[in-house]
């Protein structure tokens, strides 16, 4: 998927894991290779497509409204599809320009491209409890196993939780919808600075009061007992 996204969005895609996953043994499903799998190269104009084009090819021209422009491979056509651009401001046809409005148009296109990316990245994994009006929890990475165990522990005590495991950034609409449906949400992180919480506040305009930080950073894998204890201590507040 990372390769497909990189080609479709024409941008680097980072696959990030945490230290626990990188240094310890984990039990996972056996890898199954599919020889019939084809890579999604995204919006590419080949020889036939360039031959049929009546309009001029614009390397930075957003014809579909999703912020992603069509591209060509070197040598795809003897006279069409080639372009030369520079690192400074340019127009939709890769021509150098110092026009402020042209530069602003390019930047607005990139904003739309970022929104499109949020629709293509993996959806979060959401686990809802049977109880309504319960608290929400956001987590990611190797926190998953401890979080599920902590959820089960708290459920036995009558504390129900809705869970959401974030899998990608930029965040899609499911992330914002989950937060919106809860009065407050715990953000469980193995990160001293609670960077996921900060990112959620910055990207979604979420208030600091709504996102409750729960961090673990002693160098060891996070423990279910720790998560359960911290949530148990704060649940009676019921803001």
Residues covered by each model-derived region:
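Flexible, low-complexity linker and terminal segments
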Residues: 3-239
């Amino acid at each position: 998927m990372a390769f497909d996204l990189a080609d479709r969005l024409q941008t680097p895609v980072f696959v990030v894991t945490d230290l626990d996953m990188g240094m310890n043994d984990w039990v996972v499903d056996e890898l199954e290779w599919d020889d019939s799998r084809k890579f999604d190269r995204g919006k590419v104009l080949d020889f036939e497509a360039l031959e049929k084009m009546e309009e001029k090819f614009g390397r930075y021209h957003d014809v579909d409204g999703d912020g992603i422009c069509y591209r060509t491979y070197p040598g795809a056509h003897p006279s069409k599809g080639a372009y030369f651009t520079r690192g400074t401001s340019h127009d939709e046809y890769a021509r150098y320009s110092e026009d402020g409005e042209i530069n602003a148009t390019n930047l607005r296109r990139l904003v739309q491209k970022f929104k499109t990316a949020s629709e293509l990245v993996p959806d979060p994994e959401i686990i809802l409890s049977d109880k309504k009006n319960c608290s929400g929890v956001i987590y990611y990475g190797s926190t998953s196993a401890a979080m599920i165990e902590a959820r089960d522990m708290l459920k036995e005590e009558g504390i129900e939780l809705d869970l959401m495991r974030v899998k990608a950034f930029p965040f899609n609409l499911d992330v914002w919808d989950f937060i919106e449906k809860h009065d407050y949400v715990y953000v469980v992180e193995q990160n001293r600075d609670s960077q996921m919480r900060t990112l959620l506040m910055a990207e979604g305009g979420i208030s600091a009061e709504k996102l409750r930080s729960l961090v673990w950073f002693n160098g060891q894998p996070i423990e279910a007992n720790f998560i359960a204890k911290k949530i148990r201590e704060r649940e009676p507040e019921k803001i």
